[in-house]
């Protein structure tokens, strides 16, 4: 191997030891600083009781570890295995991503390894470039995920003041439950009437509304009242804003990861990267189309709930109340919206990573960026898409997805969730023990033979029962008072079911006994300790 000037490159035995030590120390220092920084960040999340963000950070570490495994696998297998795989020249001359150069195919390190008429599947140089692309993709995906949660939290800060107003006297007076109003005169219904009620124009209004005032104060307060009315008591002092933040942090755990279907999308994109097809051009606009459809659908859900209030009654008492339901979402599945947002973010990160990789890699810039204007447009669309998804669509999703039929687990804080989990686990253990005892008692009862089927002593003539009979006979001179220890030893020696006297219960006692048995799985009070320790 030689450099550009034709001078042979020095291998490791010809490299000064101080140079090797300096480079190695730099790599170790940077890696240790990164690991220490992630550890400190996780400790800060735990100290601030940000369990969802801590779990997202752990998932991010797992993704980076996966990328490390892929890199290690490529490094270990590129020379002895992959570069020595030979394919026919006909198979190697189809589906090229770039135009064929006039210089011909560059010689591979293992060009002499393959027989005549065959070439290497991938050269060591192309494997190294693929290695770099996978690393750049992981970095961009993690970076875009962090930007998404940061801009979403910044957007939701504007909703905090609306939540604070719900405790004021002005809000309670404006939402007096004894006040009658016409439905079409309420602010929420009035905002979504007019052109918004026309079937053909509603989608157009919803499309443009996601860019300008996607969530207003009246929308937030109305959806908040509908959620509390459906899942909590009507006069509850519930912090809806805090609940949305926890719910969004739980969804962030999904967004930050790269699932197997997303890896499949990346593989399919690379497979369709063929010269003349323009796959990377038209596929770069797919995330934008998906995101605009998602934002339009979320705005349509708010409109449909407003129109449902209008159709339900012409006069309402108190504030207008929406009814959460899964029927407003695609296929009655609110979680599908999160999947499309996740797909959009990953595909956008893939496009930006591919752009940076092709620009920074020698030899690829002329291949992928022959049209500078189109490349610049792709970058602008990608940045605008990231801002739109992070600052508008994702916060809108966090609010509107609460209008499903079921509330999310983030309705409880960390201490309450832990207490409920302990209660459930304890109840399961007690039920398992109770079922086991009943099964053992049934097995012992079934194992007791009948009177005429076995020469063994019957239940009434067992030594334990004979002992009880002997104790009850005062005229037997041989009988003596038996100590409790002797009775216990006899019971241990002959483990049979002892008949207990039957007590008849009146109806009141039966009801009391049934209620006490229903509460048999008692939970220790320590499980419901809400201390911050």
Swiss-Prot record:
Q: Which residues lie on this side of the membrane: Extracellular?
A: 1-17, 84-131, 273, 357-379
Q: Where is this region: Calmodulin-binding?
A: 414-435
What does changing residue 30 to E do?
In mlo-13; confers broad spectrum resistance to powdery mildew fungus
Spell out the molecular function terms from Gene Ontology: calmodulin binding
Q: What induces it?
A: By fungal infection and abiotic stress.
Pfam families documented for this protein: Mlo
Q: What is the effect of changing residue 240 to L?
A: In mlo-12; confers partial resistance to powdery mildew fungus
**Which keywords does the record carry?**
Calmodulin-binding, Membrane, Pathogenesis-related protein, Plant defense, Transmembrane, Transmembrane helix
- One cellular component term from this protein's GO annotations in UniProt: membrane
Free-text note on domains in this protein's UniProt record? The C-terminus contains a calmodulin-binding domain, which binds calmodulin in a calcium-dependent fashion.
| PANTHER family for the chain | MLO PROTEIN HOMOLOG 1, MLO-LIKE PROTEIN 1
What this protein is called in its record is Protein MLO
Provenance organism: Hordeum vulgare
């Amino acid at each position: 191997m030689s450099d550009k000037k034709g001078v042979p490159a020095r291998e490791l035995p010809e490299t000064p030891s101080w140079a090797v030590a300096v480079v190695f120390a730099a790599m170790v220092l940077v890696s240790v600083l990164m690991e220490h920084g992630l550890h400190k960040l996780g400790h800060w999340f735990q100290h601030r009781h940000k369990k969802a963000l801590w779990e997202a950070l752990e998932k991010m570490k797992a993704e980076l570890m996966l990328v490390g495994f892929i890199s290690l696998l490529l490094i270990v297998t590129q020379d002895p295995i992959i570069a020595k795989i030979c394919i026919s020249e006909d198979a190697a001359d189809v589906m090229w991503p770039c135009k064929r150069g006039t210089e011909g195919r560059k010689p591979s390190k293992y060009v002499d390894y393959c027989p005549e008429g065959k070439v290497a599947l991938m050269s060591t140089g192309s494997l190294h470039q693929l290695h770099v692309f996978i690393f750049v993709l992981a970095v961009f995906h993690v970076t875009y995920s962090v930007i998404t949660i940061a801009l979403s939290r910044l957007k939701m800060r504007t909703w905090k003041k609306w939540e604070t107003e719900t405790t004021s006297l002005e809000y309670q007076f404006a939402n007096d439950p004894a006040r009658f109003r016409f439905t079409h005169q309420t602010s929420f219904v009035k905002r979504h009437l007019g052109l918004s009620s026309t079937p053909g124009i509603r989608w157009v209004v919803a499309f443009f509304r996601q860019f300008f005032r996607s969530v207003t104060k009246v929308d937030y307060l109305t959806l908040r009242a509908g959620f509390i009315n459906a899942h909590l008591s009507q006069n509850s002092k519930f912090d809806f804003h805090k609940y949305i933040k926890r719910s969004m942090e739980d969804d962030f755990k999904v967004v930050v990861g790269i699932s197997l279907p997303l890896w499949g999308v990346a593989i399919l994109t690379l497979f369709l990267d063929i010269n003349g097809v323009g796959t990377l051009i038209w596929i770069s606009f797919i995330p934008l189309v998906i995101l605009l459809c998602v934002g339009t659908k979320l705005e349509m859900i708010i409109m449909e709930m407003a129109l449902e209030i209008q159709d339900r009654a012409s006069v309402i008492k108190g504030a207008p109340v929406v009814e959460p339901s899964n029927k407003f979402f695609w296929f009655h599945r609110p979680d599908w919206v999160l999947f499309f947002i996740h797909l959009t973010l990953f595909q956008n990160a893939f496009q930006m990573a591919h752009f940076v990789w092709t620009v920074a890699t020698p030899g690829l810039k002329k291949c992928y960026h022959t049209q500078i204007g189109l490349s610049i447009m792709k970058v602008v669309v990608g940045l605008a898409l990231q801002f739109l998804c992070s600052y508008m669509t994702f916060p809108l999703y966090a609010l509107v997805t609460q209008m499903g039929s079921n509330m999310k687990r983030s309705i409880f804080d960390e201490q309450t969730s832990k207490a409920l989990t302990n209660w459930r686990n304890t109840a399961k253990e007690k039920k398992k023990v109770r079922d086991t005892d009943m099964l053992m008692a049934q097995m012992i009862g079934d194992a007791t033979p009948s009177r005429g089927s076995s020469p063994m002593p019957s239940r009434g003539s067992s030594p334990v029962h004979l002992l009880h009979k002997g104790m009850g006979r005062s005229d037997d001179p041989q009988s003596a008072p038996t100590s409790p220890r002797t009775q216990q030893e006899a019971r241990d020696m002959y483990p049979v079911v002892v008949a207990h006297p039957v007590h008849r219960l009146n109806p009141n006692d039966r009801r009391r006994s049934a209620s006490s048995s229903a509460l048999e799985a008692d939970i220790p009070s320590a499980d419901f300790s809400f201390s911050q320790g």
